Amino acid sequence: MSSPEPITQREKKGNPSVAYVVTCDARLHYPDMALISALSVRESDPGACIQVVLDRESARTLRKMAHPLLEVCDHTLDVETPQGAEIFRNRWLKTQLPEWISGDVLYLDADTFVRRPVLPVFAHVSGFGAVANHNGKTLEEQVWSEDRRNELEMQWDAQYHTYVNGGVWCYRNSEPVRRLFAIWHDGWKKSVLTTGRLRDQPSLNRALYESGADVTVLPGAYNVQAGFIWQGMPDAVVWHFYENPVHLNNAFARLTAMARTADPGKLRRMVARVAKLSAPWSNPDMLASLLDRMQASGGAGSVYAREWLQGQRRHMLRHLLRGR
């Protein structure tokens, strides 16, 4: 399979790229999430060059329907991939990113939301940079049981000191980094064949250890992994969600649900509003900024404000009527 010509940074030469790898099925959930994430980058880093790598099947789908993600990004690249499910195609492209985009790159998973300027992250990095998985302080906190199972089945014994998350990372393009990606892609393919699972984090961490590339563990603020416990949210540069298209339990999910139906101007204003909140509240309406400050104050109205922001309007009204 021949490789396409890499995307170059023609319009914003010299700046690092912000990159997404987007694949989709009929639900279009991942392109919708990537749209919200890219709009947040437009707010945080207006000069960023946003580039999206697509497999051919997804590219045809998104172009046929004129998905707004294609308008928000600066460049897209369609790459022929082996046949497979959307996650397989995504990982196949992601683990070879320097093949598709030249220069220095910040990669973001689709389920991320950037709140503050993120490109200054490159001041920390000379090779490859990523944040500890789960924002954990110890390996026991960082390595998920499924990832450990994957490593055991592959008989990998990587002597890493930190196990990083594969959803937000950056690199300065160099020969050691390209070797890192070659090891990552090869390890991921072998892992898929051996285990039948598409997890890419075990092979990434193995590659970081084996490649000899300079690896920086970045400050946790560059990838605050939300999960179900919102810790470190106010100080985050990037919120990273484990998104479920069914459960609209935070602002990012609500924005995603309206990504293709909302007026573009209204959607941008909502993205800008959410970026200023201390947490991704599930009810980011026009009152959100005021109520966010109120709940943070710890004053008499803070409980009511928090309930409203969490979408618990009936609870709030009931508590008000009871004189709580």
Locations of regions flagged by a protein language model:
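Glycosyltransferase catalytic domains, chiefly GT-A lineage
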Residues: 2-324
